[in-house]
């Protein structure tokens, strides 16, 4: 391993003094990096530093502070030796501010010991050192403790000594940073050897994590840094466990939980500095345009990569594979990289074009790592070369005398931005024409002046066409003409017109004829002149077969490259040459001298039909010359010439171009010319000669040059030549020659092939080749410099024929998706141009298919390396399958559209489509908006489904079925879009917005029609609308109602029914059920809108909320209302005080003068007399909420406050809060109103019901009321002396805070309304006149509409709400029980549950007994306990009296916490004991006060003091519910008070009808009720008072005598059962016998039938005598009846019953003994009879007699049973048993033990085969089955009844 030094810092704290190794050097340890490198360098911690750290760890211990003492948690010994003592010190430091005293105990073992223990006193800040010595005797671990004792407690310090061991320390967990897929992150952590031995380690970690190094060796005290590398492949959270194995045998291990998250990286690609032609849209291919770039230069564009993810985004850039392109024009600066999270990175793209006038296209793929999609980037660039032009194409020097020199100027201009390198292909020194400068460089948009000179050496016509070679451009041509005259020779003067005629004659084949012949032919009419004056052959003179071979009459437009390469000097020429010279390139090689080299022969041929003269125009001092200088060549002849070379100086390079002019001999004299048009220019002959004078021993000077050579030839069509230009620059200071080496490829042509370049000069080459084959072909040629073989430059170029080829996608097949007839579908088709030529294409669709098939675009140009996407459009006309074959024609793109392409290629593709039909469907078909608030907005999604195979274009149509009277309103339903496109097997979501304006039921029908793309947009293909969906909506206003009301505090004495009327809740509910008016919707939601203290009211509805009356400073009157959203929409409600509606204004805006109402209102609000909690709320449909209204009795008098009750988007009701506060000791009776309405009563009712009128005493003293009944007699006299109104208790007392019930009987005799005003006097106070009204109706006329048929018409308690006080953990499952219409003397029971929702508190409940004026109500059990999260079943029973009456009862249940009750009983018991003790104590006066006081100081303090003398004081007659703030005399020792109970109220309502009346109106319901015949006796007033005063919480203790008596009785009973054999047999028989479930329901027929089947296997068992069974059943009935709650009697009657029962028991025992003897006799006779029957027929008569006795016995028993069944006692017993069974079932169902909704399961026994048909056996067996199956079930029900156990 490579070891480097690294410093680790040591960190200590007071709580933890261990050394933590945190490597901070360059963040290498426990720091993450995102390096992608896989190289690992393991760095170890400096051994010296590590050893120091470990020594400090041996000395430093972890300390703690206990009760102000700083001490170490433990002392650890390491590195000890056997038999040697090792001492460590324990430091105790006092950190508190007081002196600490402590003691310590020495260690228990003998291996640790310290100094003799002694007390330790530590002053503040003082440190004590306690030495502890360790002396080991064995090689094992030792553990002990050193204990310290203080006043606060004890603590210990652990002493531990361990053996040398292997131990490596590493972090338990390691969190690596997030990493992108394809990326790598790494983290370092420290692995320390904290053991005592050198340790080898080995790491194991699963993928994608790696740990390096995986193995190593650590010396003790050393640590190394481990690198963890994370390279994820899946984007998930990786969590692995790395294991480090070490120790002996690698059996020990450490684990590290390594966590790392892998995510997919994302890259957003955008174009920087986007241009007009760039495309940078999301979701589309991005296009970067470089524009026009000069050839040879480099253009740069940048793209921006943005990483929005939270991890690094590695990426790579791939360029499209170029199969056919060897020299790409585009490149990217970066092939791969990383973009940090949240950052941007710019990449450069370069365009360096090399092919002129071409459009380059390429593609780059930006591929992020992982699962992200790649971005395709298209780059486009145009190559633009130089555009050099000459001012003139011809320079005419006219005629010049021999020896003179003439000069003219012209300019050359570069019209492009690209730099232009030019060179004229002429040797100015050896030619009569010269151009200065002959080469140069033109910058973009520049011009240069050229000086052309003419200096002839012979009198001759001079004409030379000089090529101007330009790098990256076609050559330019300059015509130089001049004529030289001497004194003797004057040739014809050559003009530019002659050149024009010459070119025309050249095209017409007339240039091979001398002027004299042409003139003769013109005279002979063999030639003619055209409109331009040129000569032309007459057409009529030519035969017909030669007309086709007639050459072109005009000189063609020859491309510059073609003209340059095919100038006639090579084998190929455009026109036949007139004169030919060979060779044209002569290399003399080395000519060091002194001898001259041999001349080189030249051959000159004359192909004309005239004699020519050849003149060489070289200078005289030229080392190369030709002889003869002047010569004449006859027609069609050749001559031989000699080329000489004579170097002028040694070691030099020579290269020249010799020039000669050949002209017709006849033109040497202008007088020989008859026709000017026959003048022909001279022909320029050129010979390139080169050589050098270096000796072989000398090395030629080294050339310094640069050569710009391309790698490929431009793309051309097959059979066409390809041209390129090369650029050679001589960068040296000496001349440099070049020549094309002979071993170069023969299929290329290089011009010029040799030459000389001066220092700093350049040479432009043109090279051409004819590509052959579509594969790349390599051309290699060599340039030799300075005539030295080693100076050879190899140039390699490639060429190929560009085929007319396209790469078609989808394997030349296109499939259209199924298309709806009338619509169109599209399919994209992509093809690629792999060639380097732009191609033109054209799709040709047959005429018959053009209506069905189309393509866009149908024709166009595809550029090289371009991917072009076309769109095929398929529009079927029928529901059939279509098959097409379409061709595409491809040819090379030409600039001239008129030119017919020479070669075309065509491809055929196959297109398949299908025309289908389809339809739409909706989900759901029935869309219900549900309940929507009027004037609101509701949005619902509607899913459209296209299950077909084609795309559909649809339009939705809405038809509203408007409610009546709403036709003028706008449509209440809107679409977010009504038109769209649905792909096949897809769905689309349309959002419907409903805005109902009125409360009504809305319904719509949504239809659709399919659109056709062929038809106009307003029309549809299918004119029929098809129903899609039915939409319904119920527009509603918010509906709020009050369900329940409950009183607390000072209003506890008001009954619920009375309180219901005080708050006018019936009227309030009726108002809330109506629609709001327009004014009420002025402010739809509660808002501050008023500037005055009395806000304006927008509602006509006003109600009173009357809180009743209470004394001054009494408990607040609290009323709880349960609000329920009974409507269909959610709602918000609010109670707004006037201040809640007032705007917050500045003080100067408020009015100063306030009236009395405003002052009263301010007093009520400022003192919070009325409060509401909560004041606002929200309710969903069906949801309930409790609101608490509080009125505080702070001021005497009547308080009023107007509160606005606002339902958002609904009603507004003005509530008048009214509360009365009465002075103390003042009488006050609260009258709700002066009118009281009796419940309607039918006429002719002989027993009209009793009705109740309530009076509430709101004062603090009792009052006496008296109803003046004298006015009732007047009404009686007017109605035929019939008592219409009758008051049953006209006088009575009302206790403070309670309600008195005045009983009335309203008995109408006519169907009308009766009214009477009755004065009610409050004795000692005021009187009130109450108008009582009653309505009589005829039930025969009203029928089912009679008021008593609807219980809710007179009882508002028929609701099921759960009113819970905030913080209450106990509630009733039903707070109101309505029994409805019941008959008189009926017994009705209801089961409900008392639930405890607390999780840890047990509650104790007790019901307050309630006595009724008529009837009886009981609750069972009256008291009990309910555990946490449990419920107790409660049974409430109402026994109606004989009188028809109304029942409205409020039962109060007090709930206590069991712990508080236990604490109360405990304190009460202690108080009673102390009271008993103090009653017998007496006080002796001690005069020695000081001594007694001194002694008393040392006596233990007593818990209680002696009570003061007890005196009889009359208690105040005040209600227990009022906690008046009166001054009370403080007692020295108060009696413990019971805890404040929680109150639960159960409302019970019913209406009892007379039996005859009930049968007449509710006949079907009568069997559902049980009539309890025996009424309970009414208790005396004393017993009632005793029972009311008795505390239900107090239970008397059971005496020891009673307990012992109960134990003795049970013991004797159990022992008797254990010794009774009959009991054992009965138990065994019941265990063996299987009783089917259905056999419990027994009747006589089933018993007989069953006995017939089972007579073979059942023994005959005689039934008991009827008298015994009757007595037994009667006793059981009496016993059970006696246990019923209704069977309570006085003590005297109970004693008499006990005596009678004892006498009856004695009689029954005597009769039972007799009956048993009879039974034994009958059994014996039966057995003997059976035996006789088997042996003799004589006993058959006796058997018949027995059967007759049995039948008589059964009839007697049936009569007795029927008589018993009619007894009231039996009916009561039967009712009790059934009630108990049902109660047990319901209780078990509530506990989950029984599922009442499950299907019943009956298991029947298999049938038993019968062999005997004995009637006697059948009957007896039937009795046995009946008796054996009924009684156990009855006993089981009784035993399992919770009511029997509690009563």
From Swiss-Prot:
How is it placed in the membrane, per its record?
A: Single-pass membrane protein; Single-pass type I membrane protein
How would you summarize where this protein is expressed among tissues?
Predominantly expressed in testis. Highly expressed in round and elongating spermatids. Expressed also in certain ciliated organs, such as the brain, lung and kidney.
Q: Which terms are listed as keywords in the entry?
A: Cell membrane, Cell projection, Cilium, Cilium biogenesis/degradation, Coiled coil, Cytoplasm, Cytoplasmic vesicle, Flagellum, Membrane, Transmembrane, Transmembrane helix
Question: What are the residue boundaries of the MSP domain, all occurrences included?
Answer: 805-914
> Pfam families from the xrefs?
Ig_CFAP65, Ig_CFAP65_4th, Ig_CFAP65_7th, Ig_CFAP65_8th, Ig_CFAP65__9th
Give the observed phenotype of the deletion mutant.
Answer: Deficient male are infertile whereas female mutants could give birth. Deficient male show severe morphological abnormalities of the sperm flagella. The majority of spermatozoa display absent or short flagella and the flagellar axoneme is completely disorganised.
Q: What is this protein called?
A: Cilia- and flagella-associated protein 65
Q: How does it assemble?
A: Interacts with CFAP47.
The task this protein performs is described as: Plays a role in flagellar formation and sperm motility.
Q: Which family does it belong to?
A: Belongs to the CFAP65 family.
* Ranges in a coiled coil: 1457-1483
Q: Where is the composition biased (Acidic residues)?
A: 1688-1720
**Primary location class:** membrane
- Organism of this sequence: Mus musculus (Mouse)
* Protein's cellular compartments: Cell projection, Cilium, Flagellum membrane; Cytoplasmic vesicle, Secretory vesicle, Acrosome membrane; Cytoplasm
The region called Disordered is annotated at: 1668-1721
